[in-house]
Amino acid sequence: MHEGYKVKLDTFEGPLDLLLHLINQFEIDIYDIPVAQITQQYMEYIHTMQHLELNIASEYLVMASTLLAIKSQMLLPKQELEDDLDEEYMEDPREELMQRLIEYRKYKEIAERLKEKESEDNQLYTRPPVVFEFKDIPEKITTNQTDISIFDMVGALKNMLKRKEWTEPHDTTVQRMDIPIETRMKEVLQQVQSNSDGLVFDKLFPSPTKNYIVVTFVAVLELMKDKQIYAVQERHFEELYLYSMEEST
């Protein structure tokens, strides 16, 4: 796959973000993490990103190894653990990861509050007076456009591939880009703009070929980054809809 079409995840904080995303998505108790479940879901995301040939930072793979190690340790018989460790030094194998997640979640919450305060201050000092009328209220109420993360998008693609159950196999290699990314971006944007009530994400993938899936997914991410479209998902695991930013203004 051409280097220019790879999507970098460096702008996202890393594997702890993905783990928190999964914990929220599956409504998991952060103080009692089901390691087998979270490891399976985490690995599915990693495999999907690898399938798309995304640039995955090494930290994601280190976390995958950590999860697998914790999972293996928890599968050991209790007596074997007691033989290896003095009882007073025994602790939950998940403890360190749990503490990292709790601290990181606190950091994110503080950062989000600071971001909201900064936004409020900017509106207070720079926003001109506006007269609101009922006719200005849009009929279509959507969720916060910033709520959708790269992990939501990868998850939507992962679930779409499962739902589609292609009758023909995917290509296993990307030999060349049959569709230039700029061309596919224009096609996707036109398709989204022609559906003012929202375009179901799955509708962008009529072809099971890997070339088509990768270039379409990258086109969607680029359009979102350029603030030409945005995504809405009312609830976890439900269909994801794409809207044109022009429709929301």
Curated annotation (Swiss-Prot):
One BP term from GO: cell division
UniProt-listed Gene3D superfamilies: 6.10.250.2410, Structural maintenance of chromosome 1. Chain E
Family: Belongs to the ScpA family.
InterPro entries on file: ScpA (IPR003768), ScpA-like_C (IPR023093)
Chief localisation class: cytoplasm
Subunit composition and interactions: Component of a cohesin-like complex composed of ScpA, ScpB and the Smc homodimer, in which ScpA and ScpB bind to the head domain of Smc. The presence of the three proteins is required for the association of the complex with DNA.
Subcellular location: Cytoplasm
Keyword field: Cell cycle, Cell division, Chromosome partition, Cytoplasm
Function: Participates in chromosomal partition during cell division. May act via the formation of a condensin-like complex containing Smc and ScpB that pull DNA away from mid-cell into both cell halves.
The name this protein goes by in its record: Segregation and condensation protein A
UniProt keyword Cytoplasm present: yes
Stored Pfam families: SMC_ScpA (PF02616)
Entry keyword annotation includes Signal: no
Any GO CC annotation of this UniProt entry: cytoplasm
Gene: scpA
